[in-house]
Amino acid sequence: MAAERSSITLGGKGSSLSSSSVYNVASGVANVRIDSSAIERFSTRNVPSIKRSSFGIPQGLTNEETRASLAVLLNKLILSTSGPPSSSTARSVLPLKIVEILNLKAESLELGEIDVTEGENIVLEKSCASLIGICSIIDHKSTTLSQIVDSVAALSCEVTKADIASFSLLDSGDGNGDKDVIGVAGDLKVLLNGYKGTGKLEIEEISKIPWIHGKFRYVVKSVHADARRELNSGVKGGKTGSGNTGIGEALGTTLLPLLTAIKNLGVCSFLRAKLCFEKIVDENLKKCLSEKICVENENLKNSYKLAYTAHLEEDYCRFAHKLNECLGIVWRIVGLEAVAAFFALAGGELFVQKSGDADKEESKTDKKKKKNEKKAVVGKGTSLVIQFIKDRLVSNDAASDGDQMHSLMQCGEQILNLFNPEGRSFDSLLDKVKEIVESNENRRLPKLPKGTRDFAKEQMAVREKAFSIIQNVFKRHGATALDTPVFELRETLMGKYGEDSKLVYDIADQGGELCSLRYDLTVPFARYVAMNGITSFKRYQIAKVYRRDNPSKGRYREFYQCDFDIAGLFEPMGPDFEIVKILTELLDELEIGDYEVKLNHRKLLDGMLEICGVPPEKFRTICSSIDKLDKQSFEQVKKEMVEEKGLSSEIADRIGNFVKEKGAPLELLSKLRQEGSEFLDNQSSREALDELSIMFEALKRSKCSERIVFDLSLARGLDYYTGVIFEAVCIGAEVGSIGAGGRYDNLIGMFGTKQVPAVGMSLGIERVFNIMEELNEKQKQVIRPTETQVLVSIMVDNKLAEAAELVSQLWGAKINAEYLVSKRKEKHFNRAKESGIPWMVMVGEKELSGSFVTLKKLEKGSEEKEDQTCTRDRFVEELKKLL
């Protein structure tokens, strides 16, 4: 009994036509009907008509393509009635005739002559129905192929046992990777979950799968978008002859990359299939399948040439027809790859055994061979695909014939039919593959968002050590702690960071207010000072901030900042000196290696730019360019200043001469203040040099000036800096700046009525963590994840009460202690060794009966020979002495 055909309704309110619907009508699995509301919109006027010999559908199309053309034409006629009624509005006669033709289950379509009005003739002439119809078929088949082909490629990976480690390297985490290539690699890893071939053999045909398939996915999406638009666009035209001109060129432009992508996909599948053939034991089967796929490969080459020629000749309908032909060939090649992979993975032999040869006696060697072949499929996803194929073949009794070769060929034909988009079981296969990928996606281990990290065990120990040092330094300078909300009103943050404002994270669910995650700790501090009317405040804050950029090495989207700020009126340059001094103390005590603090003055920069002839309105944007000199050459920065920011080449060169200057603070300051210096003639730069003179003298007397480098190329891109600016970098470590800051006298005034001058610094603690971890690894220092001093070891099972009594006494004495109850002695020593615990309180059967404990000291995790015994009432006091 034939399956009941579904029905697709056109012209309903809010309805749209999809490529899948066109394909279903074209392939005869769905009828088409016109919504009653659409029929009412057709014209009922008696208007002159003309005879046409056809619907304007080119000769040489397949029956499927012709039906698709008629389906598109029908929709275009319906769409032409969407405007106000006129003499050009289509009548119902022609659409109903098309519906009648489409719903007939005829092998060939007899279109015949038709009578059309002027308006209907415009639709027939200008709708490009055939091109759009074929494009819809291509869209549907390409989309389904992109969903199936990865599962077939995964089977080939299983056969070849190729190394797929490169699949995990495609997503670099910097946001610059190809989304579709990464997506294919991800789906392959899901299908190959549990795969054991990694690290064995790198095969080019396997390694390039993500790129070939990813680019195919990308182009298919583009075709889908264009097909959807053209399917649901009406035909606009009248007596002037205007219409949807350029549709052919537009679709031809979209389809041409797909032709190349399809050809590459087919060639890649063909090469993988050849690798699979080598693993097939039956020589006759191997030869037969190899001949078939070689024929298809030659057909693909020829069809590709014909399609490309049609495109060059601007015959876009013939081009689409030939492209559709190429697509059909690639479908067959992919199907043959699936057949080859199935037989290579023992699916064919197992099927024959079940169907007809189960009664034959097998040798031990054959049984062992089959057992190993069963183990060949180790990927969870690929195992399910193989099992799905087996179930379909067995249920269809494909190998009932006694002739093994004939049975195998029948089996192969059924697999081909399974991978045929027009086959009855194809939808089941497609659903199964989607189910595998989606269900495995749910079970896939979660991963961290880009630019974030977890801290655990040793990392937390390093972090706590760093935070302790930092807090001690901050408190030493008389600061009080402050904590502010992790998010602020968006208006508070916007306009404070210059070009970096685009990196602020906005919160999706605003809860009635426009809020953003804090970008730094300085702006929230300024908001707090202004909001509370504070005129003098020295504070520190250690908290997380968030930046929506592509993180480089040592940089994150979520990271800690350790800030120290001084707000209020003090001795001139006193706070500036102290802030820089604090930064040097921090870096010295953290012991992260050699470093230098680059220092400059924003007024000196402004004076320099004024001297060079830069317009005042461009000062900030040019400073942002100068700030890139630590990462780019001057030629690159000059190109940006000239081509993007509108400076003349001469002005850029003058800036280049100045920003080369850097050196010891007092020496370079003396040079810049020499008689005849251009800086002395500029008020802004002269003020800066006077302030720097005071500060450099203070730094020299505090014995930290050797760490300071006076650098005119330091610009710091943030808008709110007004005076001294500085940045600390590690010498010899490519991790960028590890601390920075400067004076910002106007920022607090932006939030209140009082102008409160302020200066501050921020330590990039994430980079400090990385450096500390690397140094620990190089020096092979063992970092204890815990501070446990004593392990209470109850070496008898089911004695929790004993452990509770003893360990509670230690906790009561403020001794860091853990307990373990197990009769396995090695378990206790392993625990102590892994955690670096120096002392054990051991209680075994002997200790229980004698009411005493044994104290054992561990040196680097190994047992000391001399143990001490102690009564239960005195062991805590004894441990206090020993610790």
Curated annotation (Swiss-Prot):
PANTHER family for the chain: HISTIDINE--TRNA LIGASE, HISTIDYL-TRNA SYNTHETASE
UniProt enzyme class: ligase
GO biological process per UniProt: histidyl-tRNA aminoacylation
Keywords, in A-Z order: Aminoacyl-tRNA synthetase, ATP-binding, Cytoplasm, Ligase, Nucleotide-binding, Protein biosynthesis
Name this protein carries in UniProt: Histidine--tRNA ligase, cytoplasmic
Range of residues in the leader sequence: none
Source superkingdom: Eukaryota
Transmembrane segments: none
Cellular-component GO terms for this entry: cytosol
GO molecular function, one term: histidine-tRNA ligase activity
One protein family per Pfam: tRNA-synt_His
Higher taxonomy: Eukaryota, Viridiplantae, Streptophyta, Embryophyta, Tracheophyta
UniProt EC number: 6.1.1.21
Localisation per UniProt entry: Cytoplasm, Cytosol
Family (UniProt): Belongs to the class-II aminoacyl-tRNA synthetase family.
Main subcellular location of this protein, as a coarse class: cytoplasm
Keyword Heme: no
Catalysed reaction equations from the record: tRNA(His) + L-histidine + ATP = L-histidyl-tRNA(His) + AMP + diphosphate + H(+)
Source species: Arabidopsis thaliana (Mouse-ear cress)
